[in-house]
């Protein structure tokens, strides 16, 4: 009987350990990567993107700073209450020449603070948690009344993407990008008005996969991040 209890206990411990490792495998990977980059700079970017469907196609918007079509969305903002913790984690705002606006969660830090930063981001404290701001800003060009857009749109969370840390040739440093993906259900009558503007484009899933759109006889680039809304 005692042997049976011990065996069951061992099995339970092994099962629990295996389950814990499985569910925290990404976290363990990031922890290991942070050790390898302990004193190296890492760029951090935390954003949210919207999956907006219309007749089995996906709505993209023309980039403001890069000549491409990309998902509606943008970067989260942090609040003043984050400043003390920001200093402790040696977080530095990105230069304005790299698309940074005041309060953007586009920062850089040392690898040793990486896990702590992700813990903070996942806690949703000291930062923007609503996602309506970027939807309103991105839809401004369509001249849809804001109150109508807010009242008629249903938004639901789909998933979170934490990209593997990789070297950015543009920023000349390693970077970690985090994307929260949301589905925005916008009535067709509103989308009909939105599509009157050349700033918006409907694309097929295969065009997103190819990162290329044919428009007026020309090939137009589709952002790599668009794949996350398929």
From Swiss-Prot:
Q: Which keywords, in A-to-Z order, does the entry hold?
A: Antiviral defense, Nucleotide-binding
- For the region Required for cell toxicity, give the residue spans: 1-31
MF terms in GO: nucleotide binding
Q: Which residues form the signal peptide?
A: none
Which GO biological process categories is it annotated with?
defense response to virus
Q: Which InterPro entries does this entry report, sorted A to Z?
A: Cap16_NUDIX
Q: Which Pfam families does the record match to this protein? A: Sa_NUDIX (PF18167)
The UniProt similarity line reads: Belongs to the CBASS Cap16 membrane effector family.
Summarizing the function annotation, the protein's role is:
Effector protein of a CBASS antivirus system. CBASS (cyclic oligonucleotide-based antiphage signaling system) provides immunity against bacteriophages. The CD-NTase protein synthesizes cyclic nucleotides in response to infection; these serve as specific second messenger signals. The signals activate a diverse range of effectors, leading to bacterial cell death and thus abortive phage infection. Causes cell death in response to 3',3'-cGAMP upon coexpression in E.coli with V.cholerae DncV; inactivating DncV prevents cell death.
* Domain writeup: Cell toxicity relies on the N-terminal domain; its replacement by a SUMO domain prevents cell death in cells also expressing DncV from V.cholerae.
Q: What is this protein called?
A: CD-NTase-associated protein 16
Biological source species: Streptococcus mutans serotype c (strain NN2025)
């Amino acid at each position: 009987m005692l042997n049976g209890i011990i065996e069951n206990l061992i099995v339970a411990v092994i099962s629990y350990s295996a389950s814990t490792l499985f569910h925290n495998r990404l976290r363990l990977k990031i922890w290991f990567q942070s050790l390898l980059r302990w004193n190296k700079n890492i760029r951090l970017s935390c954003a949210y993107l919207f999956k907006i469907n219309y007749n089995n196609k996906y709505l993209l918007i023309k980039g403001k700073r890069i000549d491409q079509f990309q998902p509606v969305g943008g970067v989260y903002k942090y609040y003043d209450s984050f400043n003390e913790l920001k200093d402790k984690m040696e977080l530095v705002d990105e230069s304005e020449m790299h698309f940074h606006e005041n309060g953007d969660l586009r920062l850089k830090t040392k690898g040793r603070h990486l896990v702590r930063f992700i813990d903070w981001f996942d806690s949703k404290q000291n930062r923007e948690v609503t996602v309506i701001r970027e939807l309103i800003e991105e839809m401004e060009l369509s001249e849809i009344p804001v109150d109508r857009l807010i009242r008629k749109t249903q938004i639901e969370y789909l998933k979170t993407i934490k990209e593997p840390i990789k070297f950015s040739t543009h920023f000349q440093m390693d970077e970690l990008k985090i994307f929260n993906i949301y589905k925005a259900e916008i009535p067709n009558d509103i989308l009909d008005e939105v599509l009157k503007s050349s700033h918006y484009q409907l694309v097929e899933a295969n065009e997103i996969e190819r990162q290329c759109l044919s428009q007026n006889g020309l090939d137009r680039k589709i952002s790599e991040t668009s794949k996350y809304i398929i």
